[in-house]
Amino acid sequence: IVSKYLSPLAAIQTGLTSFFDFINHKTKNVSTIEVKSNDEFGQISSAINENILATKRGLEQDNQAVKESVQTVSVVESGNLTARITANPRNPQLIELKNVLNKLLDVLQARVGSDMNAIHKIFEEYKSLDFRNKLENASGSVELTTNALGDEI
């Protein structure tokens, strides 16, 4: 009789083990607990399932934000300082990281400019003593100073 009433514990244990393997990155998939009753074990299983699914959604949201962050860094590496991270992670630390990185990009854009490739091209022209061209839509400090320098020379 006791084993009959405690048998749902095995299903709960299996479900929790699957969940812990998932959140510890041992597996990419997670299963929910099969709920066979509406007693205390069934209610506990349902509550655990809700949290498993919520955690899975949150981790997927965080993964998407990390992917977009990596893509944003690639865009910035190519010279475009207007790129920003727009995906919203769920993890508070990732939200803070996103905000700090976007603030850093705001500062770089304000102090340098929007297009590092255009700035580099103008500097190459200046090295060849060609001061005719200007940076279009200059707004960053380096861009504005570069245009002013070209005007003076």
Language-model-derived ranges and their functions:
Residues S3-E152:
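Polar/charged heptad-repeat coiled-coil helices used as signal-transmission/dimerization stalks
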